[in-house]
């Protein structure tokens, strides 16, 4: 309802430039990049959204990042080497007020983030084996949970041509990846000014992927892969006792709470893909994934993640007609996904802030998601530019988007609250199944 919706205001600025220079011997290239970006995000929830008075929750955050990246590509005999480093100056400030938990603090942190990586590539066995090995390391000057060596990420991959005609391949890749805690987590403080998440660790994920690829022609290929992703040091909420992988599905501030880095997770499944490059006026990509996704609570129990839909299907493709006409379509399907139901009693106390009942995670699911879009393009090629006019219809199959049940305070026909206060399920007019037409143009110089 309107009284539950947060008021969100955002502003972003991004700028950057890069400089590339070949080495004098001609065996490589050095790329230097400089970029900066700013993000201002004001997130507020009021008891009265119309007048925007009586604040319940407020989170005003500002981020400023300045990055320098260096990348060197060199060729030595049969080897291709890639070496790089990055430096980032980060400034983050946050003003938070949470009436429900009696929290009110201001924070400002400024720190450096740095990393380095290296990779070597070459072919063996008469060009039948493509081999790559490398690593990456990351750290920062603020968080104390892990160091540069703790975040060492080795990676290995190869592709072996099972037949000399290069049509049938076996692919395998193994890698470790680290992700820094978010600014919201690192900047979280209690009322005494203590940074409660400063010792949070980088989230670790180990990826194992293997499969086969068959190139039936120069313009089409079929792949089937099995994957297993294992997560550790994953942030877990100490308030709700649930992994942050199962929070933040809506418009919320994620990580603005005390967390533990003891969470674990795993995602595994099979994916098959068919890709057709432009051939006989047709192009397209079709993919199907069957998977499981689980993350642990504070007690170590594995629970389904909120994106554990079991089935994912996607298609995008098109057909080029005569006289520069083109028709294209996109289709997405997702199986039933778990969601967290509302805790009625707790929400009645905290209203308009909605409290979810994470104890019931995995017991209820949303219906399947199914949506298709269609687009028509007409292109004119002129001497110095091209003009593309398009007409698009989103959700042209008129499918509804599944939503969990919503609750609001019980009111009479005049809109006045009924005493004693109670929550009732809201009846909503389903407009998610409405097709959305749009028209636009693109000019290329």
Residue ranges and their predicted role:
Residues 9-13, 62-66, 108-114, 148-152, ...:
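Residues that define the transmembrane beta-barrel architecture of outer-membrane proteins
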Residues 34-40, 76, 87-93, 135-141, ...:
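Transmembrane beta-strands of outer-membrane beta-barrel pores
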Residues 40, 91-93, 146, 160, ...:
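Surface-exposed extracellular loop regions of Gram-negative outer-membrane beta-barrel proteins
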Residues 56-71, 107-117, 197, 201, ...:
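Outer membrane beta-barrel strand-and-loop segments of large Gram-negative receptors
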Residues 78, 107-232, 280, 287-289, ...:
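Structural signature of Gram-negative outer-membrane beta-barrels, strongest in the C-terminal barrel
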Residues 284, 332-352, 367-371, 378-445:
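C-terminal beta-signal and adjacent terminal beta-strands/loops
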